[in-house]
Amino acid sequence: MLKIAIDVMGADNGVTPIVQGVIQALKSRDFNAVIIGDEAQIAPLVPPYLQSRAQIVHCTDYIRMEESASAAAKRTQSSIFKTTELLKNGDVDALVSPGHSGATMSLATLKIGRIKGVSRPAICTTMPNTTDKPSIILDAGANTDCKPEYLVDFAIMGYEYAKNVIGFENPRVGLLSNGEEDNKGNELTKATFKLLKEFSFFKGNVEGRDIFNGSVDVIVCDGFSGNLVLKASEGVASAMSSVLKKDIKSCLCSMFGALFLRGVFKRLKKKMDHSEYGGAPLLGVQKVVIISHGSANARAIECAIYQALNAIESNICSKLSDAFANKPSSAQQ
C-alpha cells in the first residue's frame, strides 16, 4: 500500500486542520499516512480505527515562515527535514507539506535531487476555468529569475503533468505574454518563443485572460509572473465572493433569488474554491512532492493527498524522466 508523508507543522492554522484532512483522506482512499509533527497534538486527533494506518513521527521543531529557506538544511530535527529524509530513503512514496514552501523546495531539490536534464524544478498550480478541466500554470513561484531554457523545461513538465495526471489527451501549451502576436513580450519571452516553436504542443503566446477561458491547458511563465497571477486570482475570487454576499443580503428580493440559485452558487463555489485543488506539485524532482498553502484547511490537505496519490499512480516522475531523455537538442540554448 502506498505511503504518504505529511508534515503537519508550520501551517498558519496549526496542526488540527492538517490532521483532520489526513483523516478524511484515509477514510476515502487506500493508503497509509506517516504524520510528522508533535505527537502530543496529533495522537488525540486520530480515531482508534485508523491508528494502524497512521504512523506518527514525533517532531516539535519546524521552520517558521519568517525564517530563511536556507536554514532548513541545517535544522536536521525540523519536521520538513525529517519528512524529506523519509522520502529520500524510500520509506514513503510522496510528501505533502503546508509549511515553509521555500524550505520544502530547497530540501526536495538538494536531498531528493532533480530529474536528469531538468534545469530548475517548478511549482505547478491548478487554476479553474470555464471548461470541465482546470488549467495549470508554471512556474508559480519557485524561480523568480529565469532563462529561456528554464521556461522550455517548464513547458515540457507542464505538458506531461497535464497529460498523465489531469487527463488531457493532447494538452495545449501557451507562453504567457502581453499579447498573442509572435513578436510580443520581453527579451525572456521572445527568446523562449523561438525555442518552444520546436514543440508540436506549443500554441504560441497567450494573455492573462487565456488562463481562465480554456483556450490553452498549460500556461508557462517565470515564477515572479506566475506568483503574481496566482495571488491576484485568489484576491479577485475573494473580493467577488464578498461583494456577492453583501449584495444578496442587501434586500429581501435578492435573498429570495439566492435561495432559488443556491445550487448554482454551490457548484460555482466548489469550482472556484482553491481548497478543492489541493496543493501544487513541485515538478522536476525525482519523487512526488506536493506543496500546500500555509492557510490550507482540512479539505485542501485531503485534496493534496489525493493529488499525491494520483501523481504516484500515473508514474509522473518516470514520464518526466523519459521526456527529458528525449528532449530535442534544438530546444536547448
Swiss-Prot record:
It is found in: Cytoplasm. It comes from the Bacteria. GO terms for biological process: fatty acid biosynthetic process; phospholipid biosynthetic process. GO terms for cellular component: cytoplasm. It catalyses: a fatty acyl-[ACP] + phosphate = an acyl phosphate + holo-[ACP]. Disulfide bonds: none annotated. Keywords: Cytoplasm, Lipid biosynthesis, Lipid metabolism, Phospholipid biosynthesis, Phospholipid metabolism, Transferase. It is an enzyme of class 2 (transferase). Belongs to the PlsX family. NCBIfam families: plsX (TIGR00182). This is Phosphate acyltransferase. It comes from Helicobacter hepaticus (strain ATCC 51449 / 3B1). The gene is plsX.
